[in-house]
Amino acid sequence: MKDPKRIVQQGYDRLGHRYRTHYEQENPHRYEDLLRTFIQVLSPNADVLELGCADGIPTAQYLSQYVNYQGVDISPIQINLARRNAPSAHFEVADMAALVFPDRSFDGIIALYSIIHLPLAEQPALFKSAYQWLRPNGYLLCIVGAGEWTGTDSNWIEPGTGMYWSHTDADTYQTWFTHIGFAILDRYFVPEGDGGHTYFLLNK
């Protein structure tokens, strides 16, 4: 298999704005409730990091109205779009697994369907880093896998666009989180097609 991260980066680069168009056609309001929930637990002007921000819609656009927002994504094309879509926010092209921040840098971290694009072996270390980057009483909101699966799709969203995913089951994610030190504030299944994902809201 080609480098999984290269597959992800090239896939999102190839799709460009068509990635957002596809999901807006499916459900244009899919993130509204969870973004409101995230804002409600954060203090005004909180420092927030998004892992896998894509084109900045809707998360960066929404959060940057209320908090000091920073987004990272592996796709340069998506980051260019994000800078246009949320001009008051700060963005960086980066591999989320290679990020380095001082401890206690953020009040909140959000990752919607993004960490599951990392190889599974790299995910526990990223969650440990996220815990360290959070300030006391900080929050991590993430949507991860519901079942164990690693694979690719060579025709994702449109013909010829490749994509890679890797995730474990929800109980294993929860075990990781509690071992790291997170408190589980909320967990629920997010249906999608014939399967779905798992929402977690965690507190340090």
Regions found by a protein language model. Give the residues of each.
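Conserved beta-strand signature within the Rossmann-like core of class I S-adenosyl-L-methionine
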Residues: 138-144
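Class I SAM-dependent methyltransferase SAM/SAH-binding core
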Residues: 49, 54-98
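A short glycine-rich, Lys/Arg-flanked "PGG" loop and its adjoining helix->strand segment in the class I
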Residues: 124-136
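Short alpha-helix
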Residues: 165-180
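Conserved class I S-adenosyl-L-methionine
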Residues: 1-43, 191
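Core SAM-dependent methyltransferase catalytic element
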Residues: 180, 189-204
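A short acidic, Gly/Pro-enriched loop at the edge of an enzyme's catalytic core
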Residues: 97-109
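Short, glycine-/aromatic-enriched active-site segment of Class I SAM-dependent methyltransferases
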Residues: 145-164
